[in-house]
């Protein structure tokens, strides 16, 4: 059983069985697949390369059989110093400190849903005596606006959601993503893909949980000559191979989400080979966040449930790169009164309007905490005052998307 399987053997068996049934119903033709022996050799080669960047010694990895692709889990390190006292030699290891993170994208003004996500991440870390890292995810061209990043940082400070480390900017960390990509390429786990977005959608393929078409491997088996010919016409993207559909023991990724419980995904049938770099050279979200979370020592990821479907891909990447897997906790989305998901594009309840309306961070946070069930009422409260009210049991009890009502 994977260390990130369901909470009980019975639930784990049920979850795994459901994934296999779902995979069988949705199986499809795929390109040439390396043999199990070849893939095992490549994975061993990849594992021997080590981490992509120095990582603080917060944890070591307990690794299952790499051929089975079980997920690695971080465990606390016990001291082996020769002068350790007898009294402490048999004591349990001190748990590693909780490290949470804010990872907003400066693509527009924060809206109420972004505030809720940051608040939950902050409250969870602080309630466990942990730390917060601030990372600005600005790889995409639409996010490369310094004034929006500065506004985002100012908004977090106004809310009283202080951080202990950062801000880090992804645009300054491209060498780390390049190193990780080279590890995957050297192991033979990637290939160039020339499919356009229009071509993928035109194929009428089923879609993954995040809305992207499930990739059927059109470019997986291209010859070197064909790759050269197409490269002369169009810059390719880079895709990561996932285990074949007939390799279900390898294909299923299982983990337990702190809010939504046992999760499993058969990568081949529910995701397909996925992008690690776009055709314009921008590193894909999945690769960048995996590298950054590990390099920054993040042990807990709190984010909206719209990213729940990305988690199996990130766990798979963590395993291939020899990186620890943090604990995942996804939270419900906030919806407008007419049932729409809040969006920066639509300027729904953005923080500029909210600051003007509520006047103080205490009034806004108190109202938000009361609306989402974190606090028993909408009394104005500071973020620090909300720590005593925060509980993951409350979040689990309200895990359906939350419709916000007028004050």
Regions found by a protein language model. Give the residues of each.
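Intrinsic low-complexity, disordered N-terminal segments enriched in polar/charged/small residues
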Residues: 6, 33-36
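Short secondary-structure transition/capping segments
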Residues: 172-187, 209-217, 237, 242-245, ...
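Non-catalytic terminal extensions that flank enzyme cores
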Residues: 39, 45, 49-108, 132, ...
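N-terminal Rossmann-like or analogous alpha/beta NTP/dinucleotide-binding catalytic cores
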Residues: 65-208, 305-306, 310-323, 381
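Active-site cores that bind ATP or allylic diphosphates and position pyrophosphate for catalysis
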Residues: 198-343, 350-355, 406-407
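Low-acidity, Ser/Thr- and Arg-rich intrinsically disordered low-complexity segments
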Residues: 2-5, 14-22, 26-28, 39-44, ...
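Alpha-helix initiation and N-capping motif
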Residues: 149, 174, 197-200, 212, ...
């Amino acid at each position: 059983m994977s260390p990130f399987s369901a909470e009980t053997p019975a639930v784990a068996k049920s979850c795994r069985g459901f994934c296999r049934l779902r995979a069988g119903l949705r199986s499809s033709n795929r390109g040439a697949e390396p043999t199990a022996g070849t893939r095992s050799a490549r994975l061993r080669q990849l594992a021997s390369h080590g981490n992509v960047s120095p990582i603080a010694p917060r944890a070591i990895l307990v690794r299952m059989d790499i051929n089975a692709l079980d997920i690695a889990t971080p465990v606390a390190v016990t001291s082996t110093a020769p002068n350790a006292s007898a009294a402490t030699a048999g004591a349990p290891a001190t748990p590693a400190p909780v490290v949470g993170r804010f990872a907003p994208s400066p693509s527009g003004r924060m809206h109420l849903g972004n505030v809720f996500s940051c608040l939950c991440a902050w409250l969870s870390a602080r309630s466990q005596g942990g730390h917060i890292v601030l990372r600005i995810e600005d790889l995409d061209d639409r996010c490369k606006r310094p004034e929006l990043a500065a506004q985002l940082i100012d908004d977090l400070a106004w809310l009283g959601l202080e951080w202990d480390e950062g801000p880090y900017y992804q645009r300054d960390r491209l060498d780390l993503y390049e190193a990780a990509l080279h590890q995957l390429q050297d192991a033979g786990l990637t290939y160039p893909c020339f499919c356009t977005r229009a071509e993928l959608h035109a194929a009428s393929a089923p879609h993954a949980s995040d809305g992207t078409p499930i990739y059927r491997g059109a470019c997986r088996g291209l010859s070197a000559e064909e790759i050269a010919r197409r490269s002369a016409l169009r810059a390719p993207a880079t895709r990561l191979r996932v285990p074949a559909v007939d390799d279900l023991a390898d294909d299923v990724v299982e983990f337990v989400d702190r809010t939504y419980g046992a999760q499993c995904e058969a990568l081949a049938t529910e995701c397909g080979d996925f992008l690690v770099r776009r055709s314009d050279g921008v590193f894909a979200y999945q690769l960048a966040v995996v590298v950054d979370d590990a390099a920054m020592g993040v042990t807990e990821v709190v984010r909206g449930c719209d990213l729940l479907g990305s988690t199996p891909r990130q766990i798979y990447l963590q395993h291939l790169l020899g990186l620890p897997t943090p604990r995942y906790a996804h939270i419900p989305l906030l919806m407008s009164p007419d049932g729409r998901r809040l969006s920066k594009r639509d300027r729904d309840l953005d923080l500029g309007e909210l600051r003007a309306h509520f006047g103080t961070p205490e009034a806004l946070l108190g109202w938000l905490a009361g609306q989402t069930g974190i606090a028993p009422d909408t009394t104005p409260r500071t973020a620090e005052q909300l720590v005593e009210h925060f509980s993951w049991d409350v979040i689990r009890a309200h895990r359906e998307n939350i419709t916000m009502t007028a004050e």
